[in-house]
């Protein structure tokens, strides 16, 4: 029996890359920390808080407000966040301009698509479903899919395996240091977007390519990146 050939693969982060979720993250986080009497966070605070899932975001919000978070309070606050976020979904979250056209163009060029996010599965998958995006992706791996998450290389490598992708012809697209480091750790070329939630200018994170909008992410750019990666391997 002939084995199925591996596919070229474009992997996308979710929050701050595929979908602008900032307003809903801030809303649910403020709903959560209000139970502890903390002052609300703002959009400007968000870049310091996101990237490692809801539990870490809550812990960082407490640290931002210089307030101790007892270990026993973490799970109840996490459940409060999850309940609020799921109830409001998709809220104000919307795909970034141009992403649908980009996903269509990449798919039509024979490039398989996947999502690799540190967002937990019970939040990530329903959000993508409600926004009509799941149909594009051969695999969606989340912060709790494996026993590790970005920036661990195995999160990307596991995503490639689940999507039937070719590690030598895969790229990672993201907005944060976790995305760029994970790609680097997995020896996969990276594209950094400038419109996400990083608190460090994307160019300073040194992805292989920086783009300001999805019109720049063409099949030709994909081929250029994977060819460059193959030559360097």
Swiss-Prot record:
It catalyses: 2-phosphoglycolate + H2O = glycolate + phosphate. Gene3D superfamilies: HAD superfamily/HAD-like, Putative phosphatase, domain 2. One of its GO terms (cellular component) is cytosol. GO terms for biological process: carbohydrate metabolic process; DNA repair; glycolate biosynthetic process. One of its GO terms (molecular function) is phosphoglycolate phosphatase activity. The active site is at residue 13. Pathway: Organic acid metabolism; glycolate biosynthesis; glycolate from 2-phosphoglycolate: step 1/1. It holds the Pfam family HAD_2. Its cofactor is Mg(2+). SUPFAM superfamilies: HAD-like. Specifically catalyzes the dephosphorylation of 2-phosphoglycolate. Is involved in the dissimilation of the intracellular 2-phosphoglycolate formed during the DNA repair of 3'-phosphoglycolate ends, a major class of DNA lesions induced by oxidative stress. PANTHER family: PHOSPHOGLYCOLATE PHOSPHATASE. Belongs to the HAD-like hydrolase superfamily. CbbY/CbbZ/Gph/YieH family. This is Phosphoglycolate phosphatase. The gene is gph.
